């Protein structure tokens, strides 16, 4: 099977449509369909900050749950939105406010539909996907070699948030270790979470979050070709979001 793995979309529907068209997908049915039966996979964070988060929920639900033609690994923003929809006490900030504003603008019956779709999508999706006979792993923030096959709380924190140190940068964002430098596994790890100006290949890992919602690009990785394809963002560029990885 051949896959097109998509980086963090964050509600940037137009960029997602542009990217999938560039990857050869046809939208005549209202959903991206590839003539050669390639499958889409998402590294998570499909919502928040961008203008069309609910549209992305509907599309990914259709592809993953209804048609079973794509793969979705949830990200930290997905986890927070899930907890919001469950009625948990979460802080509506750091991007969640844009999704909540879209949601609250809907009539109540449509709110219920979108909420149930996202809860189903989240609950029926694994923490990460092991694809192509264990040759490639799709996850949100990465995964250590010794964590592959595990799904306990420690692994969940790593996969959703990265290798965090517990310290904070001046802007409040977490300091993360560069786990990819230590990765020695044979399987490719394809992930996002931390915006980079260009797709970042380190050992058998590749970060494809090129900051679409911060004015960078939306990137897809063609697997097994290991070719990256990007489209420019329509949003303003926010330089401080592209911090060097140390």
Swiss-Prot record:
Keyword Hydrolase listed: yes
Domain of life: Bacteria
Gene Ontology CC annotations of this record: cytoplasm
Residue ranges of coiled coil: none
Keywords annotated in UniProt: GTP-binding, Hydrolase, Nickel, Nucleotide-binding
Function in brief: Asymmetrically hydrolyzes Ap4p to yield AMP and ATP.
Sequence similarity: Belongs to the PrpE family.
The protein's name in its UniProt record: Bis(5'-nucleosyl)-tetraphosphatase PrpE [asymmetrical]
Source species of the chain: Bacillus cereus (strain ATCC 14579 / DSM 31 / CCUG 7414 / JCM 2152 / NBRC 15305 / NCIMB 9373 / NCTC 2599 / NRRL B-3711)
Gene giving rise to this polypeptide: prpE
């Amino acid at each position: 099977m051949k896959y097109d793995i998509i980086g963090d979309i964050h509600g940037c529907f137009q960029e997602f449509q542009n990217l999938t068209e560039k990857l050869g997908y046809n939208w005549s049915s209202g959903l991206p369909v590839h003539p050669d039966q390639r499958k889409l996979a998402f590294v998570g964070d499909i919502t928040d900050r961008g203008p069309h988060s609910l549209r992305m929920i509907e599309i990914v639900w259709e592809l993953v749950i209804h048609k079973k033609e794509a793969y979705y690994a949830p990200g930290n923003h997905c986890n927070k939105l899930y907890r919001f929809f469950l009625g948990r006490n979460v802080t509506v900030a750091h991007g969640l406010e844009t999704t909540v504003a879209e949601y609250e603008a809907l009539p109540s019956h449509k709110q219920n539909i979108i909420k149930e779709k996202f809860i189903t999508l989240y609950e029926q999706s694994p923490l990460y996907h092991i694809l192509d006979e264990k040759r490639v792993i799709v996850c949100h923030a990465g995964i250590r070699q010794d964590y592959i096959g595990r799904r306990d709380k420690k692994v969940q924190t790593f996969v959703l948030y990265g290798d965090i140190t517990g310290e904070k940068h001046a802007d409040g964002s977490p300091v993360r270790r560069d786990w990819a430098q230590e990765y020695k596994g044979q399987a490719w790890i394809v992930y996002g979470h931390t915006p980079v100006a260009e797709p970042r290949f380190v050992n058998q890992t590749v970060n494809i979050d090129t900051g679409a919602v911060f004015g960078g690009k939306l990137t897809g990785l063609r697997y097994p070709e290991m070719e990256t394809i990007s489209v420019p963002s329509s949003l303003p560029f926010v330089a401080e979001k592209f911090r060097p990885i140390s």
